[in-house]
Each structure stands twice: as C-alpha cells, then as structure tokens.
Amino acid sequence: MKNICLLGATGSIGEQTLDVLRMHQDQFRLVSMTFGKNAEKAIPLIRTFQPKYIAVGDMDTYQKVKEASFSHECQIGIGEEGLIEAAVMDEVDIVVNALLGSVGLIPTLKAIEQKKTIALANKETLVTAGHIVKGHAKRYGVPLLPVDSEHSAIFQALQGEQCKNIERLVITASGGSFRDKTRQELESVTIADALNHPNWSMGAKITIDSATMMNKGLEVIEAHWLFDIPYEQIDVVLHKESIIHSMVEFHDRSVIAQLGNPDMRVPIQYALTYPDRLPLPETKRLELWEIGSLHFAKADFERFRCLQFAFESGKIGGTMPTVLNAANEEAVAAFLAGRISFLSIEDLIEQALDRHSVIQDPSLADIQEVDKDTRGYVNSILT
C-alpha cells in the first residue's frame, strides 16, 4: 500500500489522479490533499477518500470546509504552509505535484528534503528552478518521476538504455486549438475558441498554453532538466493525433517511441506504480487499424513564437526561464479575464524577457524576487 499526497486535487490532473486511486484502492491510500478555492468539488472528494490532512487556498475556503460534516477526523491547513504540511507528513510515500504554476516549487523542495518520491505534473517547478530542484533531488536521493505524457513517454523509452547513447529527444505536440489557423486568423480568436482543445481534456490555463505552444516550450525546459539533455538535442514535432507521446533517437539512429490513446491516467498511474505496471481497464485500447494514419509536421518557430521564447530562455538559463514562466502566467490570466487579445500573450512575454538582466546560477531568493518583479511588471503594462 502506497500513501499518497495529492497537491492540486480539484484540477484536471488531480481529478484523473483520483480516478487512478479509485480504481486501485488496494494499492493506494490518499493521506493528504490540497486544493485552492473549489470547496464544492473538494468536499465530496474528502468524504470519499477520507484524507487525514487537507490544505486550502484561503480563509473563506477554510471556513467552508470547516463547516462541512465528515465521518472521519482531519486537519485543515491554509496557504503555502498548508501545502508544505501536506507534502511532508510522515505517512506520505509519494507526493503528486499537480499544482498550477510556480506555487508548486517550495512544497516540492520541502518534500524532497523529507525523502518523499516526487511524481511531478507541475512543470513550472523545474522551469523556474530546475538547477535547485535537481540538486536537491540528487542530494537527498529522491527520484523525480514525470507525470506529463511527453516526459513519461521519454522516461519509458529510456528504461534499460544508457543516457550517453541518446542522440536527441523528440517531443510531440498536437499544435493545440489553433494548429490550422494563420497568424492573421489568430488576431480575432476568442477565449472559447482557445479552450476547445482537439485531443486532451485539461484545465483552462494549460489549454491556453497548448494553443500558444508555450506548454510545449515549458516541456522542452522540463525535459532538459529531467533527462540532463542539452537544448540542441531536443526537437519538437507537430503530431495532431497525439498517439505518439514522444520519442528517443539513439546514436545508431534507432528510435523508441511510446504510443497510446490520449489519456492522462496512463502516465499518472505509471508514475505511481513505477517500476511496476497495473491494469488500467477504463482506458481505451490503442487499435492502429482504427486510426489508419498518423501525421507529422515541423514546428514553425515564427508561427509559434512562444516555443521560440522557451528555447531561447532555456539556452540563456539563469533567471530567464523564471521570467518566461511568470510573464506567461500573468498574460494567460489576463487573456482568460478578457483583458487582452490572444496574440498579446506573446507580446507581453517578449517585453518581459527583453527588459530582464539575467542572474546566472540564481539562489531561491533570487528566483522568488525575479518572479515577483516580473509579475508586477506585466501587470503594470496591463493597467
């Protein structure tokens, strides 16, 4: 029996993680969970899974949970302190970080210090502080298990292989909601258009990131840190069916790919069961004859400027990826609030990157200060 802490229980990854736990109640037990403000969704989950510890985003949500009736005893925490407490509980074996944004960084570091296995769906943790997180994981001997489908695919393809034999990583991208639109057509797209992803069921922020291809850019940076691969050996290819989740090419030109129907429960479960596998009967079996053909195209950096920003920021390193992430989070929030157009997301990110003076090998305090400064700058443009 593995004891699980789930950070971000009411988000898309959180919900699908709970699906996996529900299917394998003899294998996993939820001992702590966190969520932001969605008490209406969380309270039934608390009653079903009966975690010992719950952390919420603010005092209003705390009161709602406090006033709810549960058949079991549970403690309730608030904010970052609550996130940390949930992650470092003695009983916890695996911390699933399904939080949205850079808020996942500190709880992850604290969990690593307590030698908890990390199942990482929160890519911003590695984007903003990859050198710190990887250094921490190495120091404490803690595995970082990828939950993103692309990184899970690479991780699976590398089982039994030596990293020194890697020629390149090929990360696949659906192209998002607007993969067939020209830049001129993108000038008039709506929020509803952007949230209509063709293949995956995801939260609002990551769906917008998919439409701008920033999500793929963040995944490139994450792959760099997870697998210690230079950016020059990471490629992105458009693959609209989302059947091949990513590939590894070796020096002898052999390519190993991981395939499957788009279902996040597969990589989530693999992270929880690694190095073993369990049946996942609720996911659809891949029948290649039903698909018939698979399509690929080269990623156009002029068409997908956010992808270019990510590669450039990653290569520069230091605090530049922190600026990239913070500016993107604020710009996407502004778009979802109806304050800016879709293409303005790129413009705001570019302005934030252009003004930044990079700090190489930043401390955690440096990263937090740059993150705060960047968010303030982007919002000053918006007002």
Curated annotation (Swiss-Prot):
<feature type="binding site">
    <location>
        <position position="124"/>
    </location>
    <ligand>
        <name>NADPH</name>
    </ligand>
</feature>
<keyword id="KW-0560">Oxidoreductase</keyword>
<dbReference type="InterPro" id="IPR013644">
    <property type="entry name" value="DXP_reductoisomerase_C"/>
</dbReference>
<feature type="binding site">
    <location>
        <position position="150"/>
    </location>
    <ligand>
        <name>Mn(2+)</name>
    </ligand>
</feature>
<dbReference type="InterPro" id="IPR026877">
    <property type="entry name" value="DXPR_C"/>
</dbReference>
<keyword id="KW-0479">Metal-binding</keyword>
<dbReference type="InterPro" id="IPR036291">
    <property type="entry name" value="NAD(P)-bd_dom_sf"/>
</dbReference>
<dbReference type="InterPro" id="IPR013512">
    <property type="entry name" value="DXP_reductoisomerase_N"/>
</dbReference>
<feature type="binding site">
    <location>
        <position position="150"/>
    </location>
    <ligand>
        <name>1-deoxy-D-xylulose 5-phosphate</name>
    </ligand>
</feature>
<keyword id="KW-0414">Isoprene biosynthesis</keyword>
<dbReference type="GO" id="GO:0070402">
    <property type="term" value="F:NADPH binding"/>
</dbReference>
<keyword id="KW-0521">NADP</keyword>
<keyword id="KW-0464">Manganese</keyword>
<feature type="binding site">
    <location>
        <position position="148"/>
    </location>
    <ligand>
        <name>Mn(2+)</name>
    </ligand>
</feature>
<feature type="binding site">
    <location>
        <position position="197"/>
    </location>
    <ligand>
        <name>1-deoxy-D-xylulose 5-phosphate</name>
    </ligand>
</feature>
<dbReference type="Pfam" id="PF08436">
    <property type="entry name" value="DXP_redisom_C"/>
</dbReference>
<dbReference type="GO" id="GO:0051484">
    <property type="term" value="P:isopentenyl diphosphate biosynthetic process, methylerythritol 4-phosphate pathway involved in terpenoid biosynthetic process"/>
</dbReference>
<feature type="binding site">
    <location>
        <position position="149"/>
    </location>
    <ligand>
        <name>1-deoxy-D-xylulose 5-phosphate</name>
    </ligand>
</feature>
<comment type="similarity">
    <text>Belongs to the DXR family.</text>
</comment>
<feature type="binding site">
    <location>
        <position position="10"/>
    </location>
    <ligand>
        <name>NADPH</name>
    </ligand>
</feature>
<feature type="binding site">
    <location>
        <position position="13"/>
    </location>
    <ligand>
        <name>NADPH</name>
    </ligand>
</feature>
<feature type="binding site">
    <location>
        <position position="219"/>
    </location>
    <ligand>
        <name>Mn(2+)</name>
    </ligand>
</feature>
<feature type="binding site">
    <location>
        <position position="11"/>
    </location>
    <ligand>
        <name>NADPH</name>
    </ligand>
</feature>
<feature type="binding site">
    <location>
        <position position="174"/>
    </location>
    <ligand>
        <name>1-deoxy-D-xylulose 5-phosphate</name>
    </ligand>
</feature>
<feature type="binding site">
    <location>
        <position position="203"/>
    </location>
    <ligand>
        <name>NADPH</name>
    </ligand>
</feature>
<dbReference type="Pfam" id="PF13288">
    <property type="entry name" value="DXPR_C"/>
</dbReference>
<feature type="binding site">
    <location>
        <position position="219"/>
    </location>
    <ligand>
        <name>1-deoxy-D-xylulose 5-phosphate</name>
    </ligand>
</feature>
<dbReference type="InterPro" id="IPR036169">
    <property type="entry name" value="DXPR_C_sf"/>
</dbReference>
<feature type="binding site">
    <location>
        <position position="123"/>
    </location>
    <ligand>
        <name>1-deoxy-D-xylulose 5-phosphate</name>
    </ligand>
</feature>
<comment type="pathway">
    <text>Isoprenoid biosynthesis; isopentenyl diphosphate biosynthesis via DXP pathway; isopentenyl diphosphate from 1-deoxy-D-xylulose 5-phosphate: step 1/6.</text>
</comment>
<dbReference type="GO" id="GO:0030604">
    <property type="term" value="F:1-deoxy-D-xylulose-5-phosphate reductoisomerase activity"/>
</dbReference>
<feature type="binding site">
    <location>
        <position position="36"/>
    </location>
    <ligand>
        <name>NADPH</name>
    </ligand>
</feature>
<comment type="function">
    <text>Catalyzes the NADPH-dependent rearrangement and reduction of 1-deoxy-D-xylulose-5-phosphate (DXP) to 2-C-methyl-D-erythritol 4-phosphate (MEP).</text>
</comment>
<feature type="binding site">
    <location>
        <position position="12"/>
    </location>
    <ligand>
        <name>NADPH</name>
    </ligand>
</feature>
<feature type="binding site">
    <location>
        <position position="37"/>
    </location>
    <ligand>
        <name>NADPH</name>
    </ligand>
</feature>
<dbReference type="GO" id="GO:0030145">
    <property type="term" value="F:manganese ion binding"/>
</dbReference>
<feature type="binding site">
    <location>
        <position position="210"/>
    </location>
    <ligand>
        <name>1-deoxy-D-xylulose 5-phosphate</name>
    </ligand>
</feature>
<dbReference type="InterPro" id="IPR003821">
    <property type="entry name" value="DXP_reductoisomerase"/>
</dbReference>
<feature type="binding site">
    <location>
        <position position="122"/>
    </location>
    <ligand>
        <name>NADPH</name>
    </ligand>
</feature>
<feature type="binding site">
    <location>
        <position position="38"/>
    </location>
    <ligand>
        <name>NADPH</name>
    </ligand>
</feature>
<feature type="binding site">
    <location>
        <position position="215"/>
    </location>
    <ligand>
        <name>1-deoxy-D-xylulose 5-phosphate</name>
    </ligand>
</feature>
<feature type="binding site">
    <location>
        <position position="216"/>
    </location>
    <ligand>
        <name>1-deoxy-D-xylulose 5-phosphate</name>
    </ligand>
</feature>
